[in-house]
Amino acid sequence: GVIVGAVGSTGLSTNLILVIESIAGDNVIILIALTILLCLLLGMGLPTTANYVVVASLMSMVLVDVGNASGYIFPIIAVHLFVFYFGLMADVTPPVGLASYAAAGISGGDPLKTGIQAIWYSLRTGVLPIVFLFNHELLLIGVENFWHALLVIITSLIGILVFSAATQAWF
């Protein structure tokens, strides 16, 4: 679309990559945090698909290369899921969180409080893609047999249930 073409033709993509790489250096954690920030910022004005296309084209190979240089192996599918999930998070995070503000309008609640509550409930959606980067077994990469896959699925389900219960104050 128009945004993707504008980012590519104006040279913004190369400048943005250079700025992010110079800030992060070889630090993978800072690079991941800056990629999250970029996803959330672009998500304020772009639909999810366009956000994914722009950020994936800008940052996916940077994350893979810096991860490899730092001793981490980030599968390309994990990086793409990471970018996609944080593109989805832009819909619930203030100040633009369109889904949160629409819910507040329907319920008659305060938009900012609804946005903050939406972030709290979506924490698992924010943690999961980071786990994808560092634990490839969640994507069934490197799983050797059926029992190993079953163990990964069961422990993942238990973990997400406990995490969700904690954010819902069931403990």
Question: Locations of the language-model features?
Answer:
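Alpha-helical transmembrane segments of multi-pass membrane transport proteins
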Residues: 1-171
